[in-house]
């Protein structure tokens, strides 16, 4: 995100923008890709609440959060674009406020990948995860990415 220092992420987190809601999609490719036509749109604070539930030493991929929200709200899938935006908003909102911290660094991208859009980028996320006992590995030579090693073993389960 650009101009993070000028944005009020806590105000963005509080806005519901008409969500939550279920939207029926009609595009055949989208239905085939996600396995259904009922797309759940969750407000940013729902992502924040789930991110806050991940305990010390555990991690959760964004995909697991999306699956949980769809399953518990009678939908086939959640919107992947807003999900990515809303976890970034939750991270930056936590970074901007004092108290009531959201442990955003525990929410990973697919495959256990660290999120470069979080405050401080992948290096800050790496330090926080290593402080919780995780091992971070680097992949790639030109397009370097960082991952939590054996992330599946540390996954938090949403019930």
Label the model's feature ranges.
Residues 2-159:
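Nucleic acid-binding interface residues in structured DNA/RNA-binding domains
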């Amino acid at each position: 995100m650009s101009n993070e220092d000028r944005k009020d992420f806590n105000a963005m987190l509080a806005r519901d923008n008409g969500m939550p809601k279920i939207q029926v999609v009609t595009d055949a490719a989208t239905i085939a890709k996600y396995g259904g036509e009922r797309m759940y749109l969750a407000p940013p604070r729902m992502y924040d609440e789930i991110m806050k539930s991940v305990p010390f030493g555990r991690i959760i991929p964004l995909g697991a959060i999306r699956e949980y929200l769809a399953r518990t709200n009678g939908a086939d899938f959640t919107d992947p674009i807003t999900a990515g935006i809303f976890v970034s908003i939750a991270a930056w909102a936590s970074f901007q406020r004092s108290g009531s911290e959201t442990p955003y660094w525990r929410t990973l991208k697919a495959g256990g990948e660290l999120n470069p859009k979080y405050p401080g980028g992948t290096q800050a996320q790496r330090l926080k995860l290593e402080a919780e006992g995780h091992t971070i590995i680097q992949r790639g030579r030109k397009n370097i990415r960082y991952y939590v090693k054996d992330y599946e073993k540390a996954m938090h389960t949403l019930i």
